[in-house]
Amino acid sequence: MKGLRLGVNIDHVATLRNARGVRYPDPVAAAAIAEQAGADGITIHLREDRRHITDRDVAMLKQTLNVPMNLEMAVTEEMLDIAIKTQPTYSCLVPEKRQELTTEGGLNVAGQLETITDATRRLSDAGIQVSLFIDADHEQIDAAKKAGAPIVELHTGQYAEAETEEQRTVELARLMEASEYAHSIGLQVNVGHGLHYHNTLEVAEIPQVCELNIGHSIIARAVLVGLDQAVRDMRNILDKAR
């Protein structure tokens, strides 16, 4: 069985920098450390309000990364233009509301199929591999397939936020079933959102999962143990799963 890919999201390095309006810590430096520690890719979310990652960060990372860039973005003309100009390896289309602290749910592909299909086609024509961040739901998985995206990233937030063991078991089973279904219709399965050092192993053990995108928990741990160690610790969890 292939090894799992770890995508390290460095958004919150930029959050820390922007909290004081200074130039440090530098997301570009953080990405280099994460690469050396075992990250298979670097994920960044260029939000419409630029609350953490900036256009300059995107441009600098494109020049310096030695691993694939996964650019998360809303489905807007501005973001499509930036992605096509930047040429990340992957572009993950996500829903976005300005008032939310973090992405709260999956993209409603079924409800805006024409728009998502058009965005997917434009990005694909530019040589960018498209993933759609969706809930673990058959309707959305089917819509992602119809839209022409080769990859889905299943939203693990409900699993991560489960307050009881029973609820967590139900959510894990839902992720397992959705992963199996998406894989069966020819989609690559990635997962992400809310994953940390105590809940990632079970998700990583789902056979169809290829990549986990994890950010906040790694950056939070980095404050205590350093970024290199924080990434290595998560890498070890993924390696244990396979």
UniProtKB/Swiss-Prot annotation:
Residues that, per the record, bind 1-deoxy-D-xylulose 5-phosphate: D11, H12, R47, H52, T102
GO molecular function, one term: pyridoxine 5'-phosphate synthase activity
SUPFAM superfamilies: Pyridoxine 5'-phosphate synthase
Keyword annotations: Cytoplasm, Pyridoxine biosynthesis, Transferase
Protein localization: Cytoplasm
Record function comment: Catalyzes the complicated ring closure reaction between the two acyclic compounds 1-deoxy-D-xylulose-5-phosphate (DXP) and 3-amino-2-oxopropyl phosphate (1-amino-acetone-3-phosphate or AAP) to form pyridoxine 5'-phosphate (PNP) and inorganic phosphate.
HAMAP family on file: PdxJ
UniProt-recorded name of the protein: Pyridoxine 5'-phosphate synthase
Source species: Idiomarina loihiensis (strain ATCC BAA-735 / DSM 15497 / L2-TR)
Gene name, Swiss-Prot/TrEMBL: pdxJ
